[in-house]
Amino acid sequence: RAILNWQKFVFYAHNQVEKEANDALVLSIDLSKQRMAKLKNDPIAERDQTSNTAYNRAWMHALFGRYGEARKNLEDVKNINEKINSPTAMHGYNNLMGMVSLMEGKAESALQFFEKGNPDNTYFLYFKALALKAVGDKDGAKEILTDIANTNFSYWELAIVRNRAKKLLENT
């Protein structure tokens, strides 16, 4: 049920239905905490749960234009994930920080974060394309948007950004 409510959060947040998005996120977090209670003393699971909670809260704040709040939650994500010995540990932080920076009008800064993020995350590649377009790299943006628009697989990230990418390509 935690995953189902997380999916509801994603749906409502991307449709700018704030109360329902928040309710779904809170329920998803609560259900995840209940699941964590059953794991008892698993420090890695607890760390991941804390990081994921901060990440999802940051994402929600970003989607509703509360960038300062998003940055506060992302600082928590950074403090947790930078201690993980993995080359991918900071991907989520960097991708979402890139999105926040872009939405604040800081496209150059956004690109620096996107370069350190997951290069295969379609959702954030869309925002990277927006940042490239904002700094005048229309060819770079077009390449990413074309890849997104021509992808024929089905997954939630693509469902959110594919039609948006197609519209941007039509206006280029």
Where are these predicted regions, by residue range?
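Boundary/linker segments of alpha-helical solenoid repeat arrays
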Residues: R1, S32-D42, N81-A89, N121-F127, ...
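"A position-specific structural signal for the A-helix of alpha-solenoid helical repeats
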Residues: I3-Q7, Q49-N52, N56, M60, ...
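TPR/TPR-like (Sel1-like) alpha-helical repeat modules
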Residues: V26-D30, E75, N118-D120, K138-W156
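Generic long, charged, amphipathic alpha-helical segments
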Residues: V100, G105-N118
